[in-house]
Amino acid sequence: MRDAIPLGRIAGFVVNVHWSVLVILWLFTWSLATMLPGTVGGYPAVVYWLLGAGGAVMLLASLLAHELAHAVVARRAGVSVESVTLWLFGGVTALGGEAKTPKAAFRIAFAGPATSLALSATFGALAITLAGVRTPAIVISVAWWLATVNLLLGLFNLLPGAPLDGGRLVRAYLWRRHGDSVRAGIGAARAGRVVALVLIALGLAEFVAGGLVGGVWLAFIGWFIFAAAREEETRISTQQLFAGVRVADAMTAQPHTAPGWINVEDFIQRYVLGERHSAYPVADRDGSITGLVALRQLRDVAPSRRSTTSVGDIALPLHSVPTARPQEPLTALLERMAPLGPRSRALVTEGSAVVGIVTPSDVARLIDVYRLAQPEPTFTTSPQDADRFSDAG
């Protein structure tokens, strides 16, 4: 995930935190700090806010445990784990591949909600124990709050639609029933759209009834799930469409190279005008490739600065650009490009030489070509999917 800050490793997994975690940390703190006075009165405001912050941190730790459970079970199933990231909507466990069997997929998906439900039971038992040893009521209230929120988190994630864990469970069930992981994945994604529309409707109803913050938040979550479910369906459909397709089939071969030492104004006048390319590998004076520059980056340079800014200054560093080999499956490259967003490009290399480039426009063209060649497939990308790649170019 872009803009994520690495925190280190836990249990061997790379753990990142996105800046949007600050938003949910504040929301959790505010929620608990404003709830406690109505439950246990008589404390100074600073106590409520300190306990609110402490409870929020514990809840973030619970979210991390939820994601680490996915990661641990995935590793045991032989699926590589690239990272675990906390962000606005909880967490994301980035897997380096797919489960090989429906049973393994089911276990990986269920591990997260099971952990949240177990944490709910643990915090509930802690609250009961603390009550038995005459612990201050305000501390017991925080424990009950953590038990309740973890329970809701576990149950919410079991809703039957991708990208929620419940959608992964639906996918595992359909995969086992029909023996087709693609059909199962698309079915789970479409179920996710239905779940999202229900959440949006409930959020709007709550908003109309006077629950302004809760209604907007619920509708926003529904909108996110709808968008993510559509993205999931597009990804699976594209994988099916491109089964057996190599990177060499999609790339633009022998792309023109941008000299990194010339200024942006000269580059636009001498290289870009009259060309159809949207991105260029950037080379230094000895011919080695140092990065990639796209038209969007050129546009971002103010006209007054173009004569004093070199192409190398604005190029995306090579270590941030996905790379692939010509004979590699295209689907594997698209998986690596996906986390970087719809505007991402990739360089195709043989040895130390760049032999091609893959842009969103290249992918969009290939989608159109393969749709023409397969006019009535069981599952295909929609016309909007090709437009999505094309617009990003």
From Swiss-Prot:
GO terms for molecular function: metal ion binding; metallopeptidase activity. One of its GO terms (cellular component) is plasma membrane. It is a multi-pass membrane protein. Zn(2+) binds at residues 66, 70. It is found in: Cell membrane. Disruption phenotype: Not essential. No effect on processing of anti-sigma factors RsdA, RskA, RslA or RsmA. SUPFAM superfamilies: CBS-domain pair (SSF54631). Its cofactor is Zn(2+). It comes from the Bacteria. Binds 1 zinc ion per subunit. It holds the Pfam family Peptidase_M50. Induction: A member of the dormancy regulon. Induced in response to carbon monoxide (CO). It is hoped that this regulon will give insight into the latent, or dormant phase of infection. GO terms for biological process: proteolysis. The active site is at 67. Residues 251-308, 315-376 form the CBS domain. Belongs to the peptidase M50B family. This is Putative zinc metalloprotease Rip3.
